Regions:
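Short recognition helix of helix-turn-helix/winged-helix DNA-binding domains
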Residues: 1-60
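Winged helix-turn-helix DNA-binding recognition segment
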Residues: 37-97
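Short, amphipathic alpha-helical interaction segments positioned at domain boundaries
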Residues: 102-107
Length: 107
């Protein structure tokens, strides 16, 4: 993952109307993904991780957020079901695609 220290995300005020807003784990998970998504395409071990995507392992994600593995799996499944993320499983993790990344990180 490449995070540019001086980059930022735009968080619209209507985020408080988001269906998962009152679930602290979901908010923390989604904000973690937003803040750690690539701001430009990057090659990593012959895999291109595009803008709006982040490479994570569930174990690392659990350590970083303090959310249990089971709650992470549930949260990711919910975000996928509501079409807010897509993900591709890899041998050592997964690439999470934030579907509306452009809304939060304008060019």
């Amino acid at each position: 993952m490449n995070i540019v220290d001086n980059s930022w995300i735009k968080l619209p005020r209507n985020f408080v109307n988001w269906s998962w807003y009152h679930d602290a784990n979901m908010v923390q998970l989604y904000l973690y993904l937003l803040l750690n998504a690539n701001v430009y395409d990057v090659k990593y071990n012959d895999i291109t991780i595009k803008r709006g995507e982040c490479l994570v392992s569930l174990n690392h994600l659990s350590k970083e957020t303090g959310i249990s593995l089971q709650k992470l799996r549930t949260g990711l499944a919910r975000l996928q079901r509501t079409k807010e993320i897509e993900y591709k499983k890899l041998q050592n993790g997964r690439i999470i695609v934030l579907v509306d990344f452009k809304k939060f990180q304008p060019i």
